[in-house]
Swiss-Prot record:
This is Copper-exporting P-type ATPase. The active site is at D443. It is a multi-pass membrane protein. The keyword Chaperone does not apply. Optimum temperature is 37 degrees Celsius. Active across a broad temperature range. ATPase activity is stimulated by Cu(+) ions. The keyword Ligase does not apply. The modification N-acetylthreonine is found at T2. One of its GO terms (cellular component) is membrane. It comes from Mycobacterium tuberculosis (strain ATCC 25618 / H37Rv).
Length: 761
């Protein structure tokens, strides 16, 4: 997609968006970005999460030239035909491609492993053309199925870098070359007597090692791609939360429905109850209650009248508004919030995979050891073929197939156990930060509170009963769809019939109940000056807590006050206390008013409160905390929490929350119980410990076998044993996570990690 934008000093700037394919990690995104930024007059930013490169240039740069530059770097690029976001899922496509490669590789691996061992250990079983049969079965696995690793390894070589793919590719290639040399070389098979002599002296056919590494790593990469797809699906669906169509008001007063993306600035459009506001703008006519909670965190609907501002992405609850568009499309606050989420996720993805960090040191070390091994054999007077064989053996044994299982197995077991506890772990990259989390930031509406208004108190004037006041109010409010009315109506089942019902926008409702005129609404409308002192005291108390005070009047006489509030979750206080017991600092960050925020913080035990803050402000607070050296976990549920969840070191979203929050978070709390927040932190930490221990197992056996290979004593039995044992211990160690947590969800008690060592260890 190519658009004209306004740059600095009002200069015309051309913006081009390219969809990049072939990137396997954030390092790839950096390479593409660096390649594009080397072009004159080009400023590029590449988002690995969305696979989109956004290029701003003050020159007439041809998009084809940009695509060609990306291709020279080893990737594919095409011009975006939309706004850069697409319904397609690159991670899902990648997972499908990996599954096809995995299925074919797994089918071929079984006969390759059987025949390699049989022909190597028992030469008498070899038949005419056995070399061709074995090679025909193995080569598709080590070439086509393993091509994703070879492609990245070659790209890394061009950039003088090393990653996990480099290690895998080198190991597979070395094992394949050695095997081809063994099976096609003019070697006469040596007949051996005794089973141990046959096993320990078997010919060096390592096709099963090369194929096994390919299969095991493909398994891990497939599950990793699936997890990425699931993690990104909510963010890709974010655009669905905005309005699709808008009713534009024409000069003659008629309306015309057009696609929302065709709306222009200064055009007027109509919004009715239940509809989503299509753009940021100014209300010019009408009055309506607007649910702003998704954008600002304000629990109570906001009454918008002519001259009031409205925000795109919010929902009109009642009334009708005519709005003049001030910001449309990518310029709206909603679109800006989407960009904040994407940018924050892209920054979080900059952390390299743990395996890549290890490989960046391990690969050069192995190559040096292999070279020293060959040199040592030659200096010692060994034959050149023995020197080359020993060097290749070092490369073969250095590639641990369990490396591909180290992270996926831990994540699979942790995800299964987490599901039992009401916790869903979306990915492992950001979980590395959990070991150092020292600050937990909570949103208020929908996180610490239910997000639904409820009656918190009823105060009756002398001569009236609280139940009587509530019943009269509920009878009238039952005919209204206002959120406060719904809360009052739901507070009791005791109702009579109502007649002459009227709803006065911005004031309240009225009606006749059993021949008595009843009004329910704002104190200013009812006439609070003539109220009994206890009613005025109840109003002051409710408003000091950030609650809404609703007055009830019968036949012109004020008879009671009903306090309505966003109820605090029962599990909130215990969760905050559990975090404090773990030595964690807690904060409340909300767009709601200071009085309401302070009241909720006091009830749940949080000392630090920042209220009346916009979504961008939440991101700023998170960044300030991180700049001071804090490692921050954020717990939220709304659209307005998305950017902060993505920017935090660890984001936790309530499962019933919006797609934005879920898309931005690293951990989803499936059930609406906050007592699993500390347990989620514990599970994330335990998972990362398991992943790291798996890495030790994955590398440990192979590192121990390197001296054996360098000494020229390596054979398929040793290589196969190292592969099998390292994989076995990785899986066994991951299964320990099934013991995590003492209590299942719903018992009301947060259990600490209960992990025991596997019996095999």
């Amino acid at each position: 997609m190519t658009t004209a934008v306004t740059g600095e000093h009002h200069a015309s700037v051309q913006r081009i968006q390219l969809r990049i394919s072939g990137m396997s990690c954030s390092a790839c995104a950096h390479r593409v970005e660096s390649t594009l930024n080397k072009l004159p007059g080009v400023r590029a930013a590449v988002n690995f999460g969305t696979r989109v490169a956004t290029i701003d240039t003050s020159e007439a740069v041809d998009a084809a030239a940009l695509c060609q530059a990306v291709r020279r770097a080893g990737y594919q690029a095409d011009l975006c035909t939309d706004d850069g976001r697409s319904a397609s899922d690159p991670d899902a496509d990648h997972a499908r491609q990996l599954l096809i490669r995995l299925a074919i590789a797994a089918v071929l691996f079984v006969p390759v492993a059987d025949l390699s061992v049989m022909f190597g250990v028992v030469p008498a079983t070899r038949f005419t053309g056995w070399q061709w049969v074995l090679s025909a079965l193995a080569l598709p696995v080590v070439t086509w199925a393993a091509w994703p690793f070879h492609r990245v390894a070659m790209r890394n070589a061009r950039h003088h870098a090393a990653s996990m793919e480099t290690l895998i590719s080198v190991g597979i290639t070395a094992a394949t070359i050695w095997s081809l040399y063994t099976v096609f070389g003019n070697h006469s098979p040596i007949e051996r007597s005794g089973i141990w002599q046959a096993l320990l002296g078997s010919d060096a056919i390592y096709f099963e090692v090369a194929a096994g590494v390919t299969v095991f790593v493909l398994v891990g990469r497939y599950f990793e791609a699936r997890a990425k797809s699931q993690a990104g699906s909510a963010l890709r669906a974010l655009a669905a939360l905005s309005a699709k169509e808008v009713a534009v008001l024409l000069p003659d007063g008629s309306e015309m429905v057009i696609p929302a993306d065709e709306l222009k600035e200064q055009q007027r459009f109509v919004v009715r109850p239940g509809q989503i506001v299509a753009a940021d703008g100014l209300a010019v006519d009408g009055s309506a209650a607007v649910d702003m909670s998704a954008m600002t965190g304000e629990a109570k609907p906001t009454r918008v009248r002519p001259g009031g501002q409205v925000i795109g992405g919010t929902t009109v609850l009642d009334g009708r508004l005519i709005v003049e568009a001030a910001a449309v499309g990518a310029d709206t606050q909603f679109a800006g919030m989407v960009r904040l989420v994407e940018q924050a996720q892209a920054q979080k993805a900059d952390a390299q995979r743990l395996a890549d960090r290890i490989s960046s040191v391990f690969v050069p070390a192995v190559l040096v050891i292999a070279a020293l091994t060959a040199a040592g054999w030659l200096i010692a007077g060994g034959q050149p073929d023995r020197a080359v064989s020993a060097a290749l053996a070092v490369l073969v044994i250095a590639c641990p197939c369990a490396l591909g299982l180290a992270t996926p197995t831990a994540m699979m077991v942790a995800s299964g156990r987490g599901a039992q506890l009401g916790i869903f772990l979306k990915g492992y990259k950001s979980l590395e930060a959990t070991r150092a989390v020292d600050t937990v930031v909570f949103d208020k509406t929908g996180t610490l509170t239910t997000g639904r208004l409820q009656v918190s108190a009823v105060t009756a004037a002398p001569g009236w009963e609280a139940d009587q006041v509530l019943a009269l109010a509920a009878t009238v409010e039952a005919a209204s769809e206002h959120s406060v009315a719904l809360a009052i109506a739901a507070a009791t089942t005791r109702r009579d019939a109502v007649t002459d019902f009227r709803a006065i926008p911005g004031r309240g409702v009225s009606g006749t109940v059993s021949g008595r005129a009843v009004r329910v609404g704002k104190p200013s409308w009812i006439g609070s000056s003539s109220c009994h002192p206890n009613m005025r005291a109840a109003r002051r108390h409710a408003e000091s807590l950030g609650e809404t005070a609703v007055f009830v009047e019968v036949d012109g006489e004020p008879c009671g006050v009903i306090a309505v509030a966003d109820a605090v979750k029962d599990s909130a206080r215990d969760a905050v206390a559990a975090l404090a017991d773990r030595g964690l600092r807690t904060m409340l960050l909300t767009g709601d008013n200071p009085e309401s925020a302070a009241a909720v913080a006091t009830r749940v035990g949080i000392d630090e409160v920042i209220a009346d803050i916009l979504p961008e402000g939440k991101v700023d607070v998170i960044e300030q905390l991180r700049d001071r050296g804090h490692v921050v976990a954020m717990v939220g549920d709304g659209i307005n929490d998305g950017p902060a969840l993505a920017r935090a070191d660890l984001g936790m979203a309530i499962g019933r929350g919006t797609d934005v929050a879920i898309g931005a978070a690293d951990i989803i709390l499936v059930r609406d119980h906050l007592d699993v927040v500390p347990l989620a932190l514990d599970l994330a930490r335990a998972t990362m410990r398991t992943v790291k221990l798996n890495m030790v197992w994955a590398f440990g056996y192979n590192i121990a076998a390197i001296p054996v290979a360098a000494a020229g004593l390596l054979n398929p039995l040793v290589a196969g044993a190292a592969m099998a044992f390292s994989s076995f211990f990785v899986v066994s160690n991951s299964l320990r996570l099934r013991k995590f947590g003492r209590y299942p969800l719903g018992c009301g008690t947060v259990g600490g990690p209960q992990m025991t060592a596997p019996s095999s260890a």
